[in-house]
């Protein structure tokens, strides 16, 4: 019995190259109205004004790398022993279709070892700092990081507050009660170029030795110890 063999030509493969993009998710540049964190990544943009700038577009992402970084103690924790198992997990909401699932059904992209650094901060050391996607992510425009441990999601103290300043009595009225500011903390007041030291902290008022005259009574108070910066490195596959 004769067999007909039909020869076919394979479709030519598109040549591809790998591009690398570095970005720093800075909590002071999070999107307005999104708590606790949500970031917009803008191609060829400049970091600032609530934008995280990247050199090129984040398309066809095949791998994501994270590096060690610092975080303040979450609101749910007061001591290093409060971190169950000494681990924290990081999950990106927009990438939920591809993530690691643990035995409890919780998803994450990175696992970290928690290392104490000071009474206010811990360092997160990646257990495995690379996550490879099974299928390339078409585009990454927004990233919403969610932190949790085995007890559940973790919330963090704010790193920026809108405050009322009284230059005559050298005190600042804080809009919240559950802040983590204490005497001796360093803060930055918008409109003034130097860090200030808190002389006294009483309820939701902080007193500073010298507050310069400011053009507006309602200004921004930046709290360096609460700032979170997540360093990420993306690898993309581009057709050429």
Swiss-Prot record:
Where in or outside the cell it occurs: the entry states: Virion
Q: Which GO terms describe its cellular component?
A: virion component
Lineage, top-rank taxon, reads Viruses
Main localization, broad class: virion
Question: Which keywords are on file for this protein?
Answer: Late protein, Virion
What triggers its expression?
Answer: Expressed in the late phase of the viral replicative cycle.
Described by its record, this protein's role is as follows: Forms the penton at the fivefold vertices of the icosahedral capsid. Together with the minor capsid proteins (p17, p49, and M1249L), forms a complicated network immediately below the outer capsid shell, stabilizing the whole capsid.
Family named by the database record: Belongs to the asfivirus H240R family.
**What's the name of the protein?**
Penton protein H240R
Which species? African swine fever virus (strain Badajoz 1971 Vero-adapted) (Ba71V)
């Amino acid at each position: 019995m004769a067999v007909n063999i039909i020869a076919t030509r394979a479709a030519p493969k598109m040549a591809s190259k790998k591009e690398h993009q570095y970005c720093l998710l800075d909590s002071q540049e999070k999107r307005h109205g999104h708590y606790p964190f949500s970031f917009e990544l803008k191609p060829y943009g400049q970091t600032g004004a609530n934008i995280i700038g990247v050199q090129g577009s984040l398309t066809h992402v095949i791998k994501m790398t994270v590096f060690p970084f610092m975080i303040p103690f979450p609101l749910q924790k007061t001591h290093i022993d409060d971190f169950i198992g000494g681990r924290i997990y990081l999950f990106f909401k927009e990438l939920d279709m591809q993530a690691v699932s643990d035995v409890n059904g919780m998803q994450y992209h990175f696992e970290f070892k928690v290392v104490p650094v000071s009474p206010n901060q811990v360092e997160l050391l990646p257990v495995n700092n690379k996550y490879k996607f099974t299928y390339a992510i078409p585009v990454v425009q927004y990233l919403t990081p969610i932190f949790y441990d085995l007890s559940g999601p973790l919330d963090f103290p704010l790193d920026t507050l809108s405050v009322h300043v009284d230059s005559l009595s050298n005190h600042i009225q804080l809009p919240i009660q559950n802040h983590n500011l204490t005497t001796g903390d360093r803060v930055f007041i918008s409109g003034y170029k130097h860090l200030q030291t808190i002389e006294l902290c009483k309820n939701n008022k902080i007193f500073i030795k010298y507050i310069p005259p400011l053009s507006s009574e309602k200004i921004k108070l930046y709290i360096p110890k609460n700032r979170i910066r997540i360093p990420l490195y993306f690898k993309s596959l581009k057709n050429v």
